């Protein structure tokens, strides 16, 4: 398949949240954005596990990439004559990394890839692991640029778009998935208006996405999550563009909580709905969305904003982090392998196998 070349990503891609120094990992602390730009150093796999669990790093692709470097750091703590022995000794650390955020399939995919690489490695297994982690990050950036071009091509000139959560450079190796499509659409003059939902309770849209777009000089308008239906009714939005943490064999898609209601609202108003994610996010072993484990986080996250409590004491809260959008509500799934319009199990199988 021909891969169209997107515009120069250096114009609209200024943020890098993951920095490997050759000795340790530096992660942009996304809990403190937009007011504090601070990097956290990870010197061990346990540091990386904690960074994933506590949302220093977030976004399915970024979590996977960071887990790869976590495996590299774990390798610094053991001795082994070859990859097979190393794999046996590293398995507990790999399992801890996997347990840090269970919903995102990229995390499991990267760790499985590191296991395969190790099992074939010889005495140079440490170097092989580091090369593999570098390849994973490089491939993600290449895939994002490709997806940006594919997705932007679907958007008519002069369109308005709405996005949810953060799917840009902060959530990936760079450029972004859904936000990469928006960057490309802006560069091509296809997108005239960008709206961003605030994305409670962690406010990834309000804290991260509008800040990231601001770094690139892209104007964006923030809305309350509850304003999305009214916005769509006004006719200012032609596409909703979101990322994914897991895409099932039938096109059902797990993504940040609130995505499902956007898809329902978009269908009612005749607004198109696009999911953008790398092929690594596709899980052909999971038949449908009902089988996806939905992460539940501490209800305390819902009881305040930025550490300031806004709810009376003694109030219960329900805090699922993801929901599942049925494939039937999705107009297009965009990966680096191309576009699947009106996705179903047959089309998914034709593109991704199984």
From Swiss-Prot:
Q: What class of enzyme is it?
A: isomerase
Q: Which domain of life is it from?
A: Bacteria
Location of the active site: 245 (proton donor)
Q: Name one GO biological process term.
A: L-methionine salvage from methylthioadenosine
Q: Which GO terms describe its molecular function?
A: S-methyl-5-thioribose-1-phosphate isomerase activity
Pathway(s) where this gene product acts: Amino-acid biosynthesis; L-methionine biosynthesis via salvage pathway; L-methionine from S-methyl-5-thio-alpha-D-ribose 1-phosphate: step 1/6
Q: Which InterPro entries match?
A: IF-2B-related, IF-M1Pi, IF_2B-like_C, Initiation_fac_2B_a/b/d, M1Pi_N, NagB/RpiA_transferase-like
In chain numbering, the residues marked as site (Transition state stabilizer) are 165
**What does the entry list as the binding residues for substrate?**
58-60, 101, 204, 255-256
Matching Pfam families: IF-2B
- Its EC number is 5.3.1.23
**Catalysed reaction, written as an equation:** 5-(methylsulfanyl)-alpha-D-ribose 1-phosphate = 5-(methylsulfanyl)-D-ribulose 1-phosphate
Q: Identify the keywords attached in UniProt to this record, alphabetized.
A: Amino-acid biosynthesis, Isomerase, Methionine biosynthesis
Q: What HAMAP family does this protein's entry cite?
A: Salvage_MtnA (MF_01678)
Q: Which family does it belong to?
A: Belongs to the eIF-2B alpha/beta/delta subunits family. MtnA subfamily.
The record, for NCBIfam families, names: eIF-2B_rel (TIGR00524), PRK05720.1 (NF004326), salvage_mtnA (TIGR00512)
Q: What does this protein do?
A: Catalyzes the interconversion of methylthioribose-1-phosphate (MTR-1-P) into methylthioribulose-1-phosphate (MTRu-1-P).
Name of protein: Methylthioribose-1-phosphate isomerase
The major lineage groups are: Bacteria, Pseudomonadati, Pseudomonadota, Gammaproteobacteria, Lysobacterales
Question: What gene codes for this chain?
Answer: mtnA
